[in-house]
Amino acid sequence: WNFDNAGFVFSTKLGNVTTLRYVNFGFNYHKAKSFNKTTTMEGQLGLSQTELMAAQANGMFYDGIDLAYYTEKGINPYDDKGNAGWLGALGWDAELFYTDDHPTLPFYPYVTNPYANYRSEERGGVDQYDFNIAFNFNDRVYFGITIGAYDVNYRKTYYYGEDISNDGEYYDLWSDNRIHGAGWDAKFGLILRPLEESPLRLGLAIHTPTFYKLTYTTEAEIGADLWYVDNETGEEFMDYHSYSTYYKLGDKKMNREFELRTPWTYNLSLGYTVGHNLALGAEYEYQNYSSMKFYYPEGDKMEYESSQVKNNTKGVSTFRIGAEYKVIPEFAFRLGYNYSSAAFEKNAVKALSTNSLNVDTDYANTKSLSNYTLGIGYRGSSFYADLAYKYTSQKADFYPFALPTETGTYDTPAVTKVTNSRSQVVFTLGMRF
């Protein structure tokens, strides 16, 4: 059970003959997004995450950051001065890739086809608080403005491990990631009744981008159990060793502040009432996700992150249709359908920069989303209640990582097809005073 919505509207009637008939003031809270999800997978991959560790280390090397030199000089790769990618640095510390005897690459892995285990837990959500004012002109023109405030709280715990040989060698990678902060936006809406004698309604709405100020907090740890050879005796032995960014940073987590600007939203709607019993409605909405931008706190654009969004996402069209039929004036049945196209390009990948703090390499390219709703409502003189069933379905292509190649493309393990479905029962109560 969740209490995800609450609000009120205060209506002021100014007169029956004045141009401005009503002014309404409202407030509404609702859970705009829930991140709660747990995912587990395992299997033979054909590729190893250690290849991605080595690839990031090579990228750092060509950018002037040599992990072998850092080790020799005692330079901490995990702090701000080190400016190294954590995935490559942890893999290097855990000795999961080599640095010599290769003809072309500074670093290269020795694992190619491990058995992998993956688990992630995501928790939190986005709470939205809307403050609005609306105007009714001659019962034919309706205009409203809404200022929205957002509170973001997201947490992801990530675990990934590989059995890298038949002799018991393995490694485990873990990270804890949090994003918290706040944002705001503005919404402008207009509804017109173009013909006084007709129940036809036309609507237009524009939503500004949401301007977020966020803080990313992370820590990571790797542990590996590997076979070694004693140089003096020649005997083989297995040794477990682990490395933690929390320890390397002096018992601290790493914090990064950034800003996010979401796309503009454009909405068109159409409504019509047939007689006194049947109401029909339809909407079309568009958001271009490739226009999202990331910024540093100082205001400069984060070029790499913004370019990745531009290359991997696209515009999303959303269609909504609904109908309400009043059996008697107090009771009504409702049906609704909502379709949103996919936000990701077909071959979208998660590509980490050479200095990325992220070690959670997994990603899922979600497909189109469908919502189906069925409900019943009661309207009394001072009390109303609504009961609705909502079913949501969305497919996704899941990958544990994407490995860059020398040609500029990406290799991935075989795709895992995922279907996310959710059923909800929503009950709403309201009072009129």
Regions found by a protein language model. Give the residues of each.
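Outer-membrane beta-barrel porins/channels
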Residues: 4, 9-433
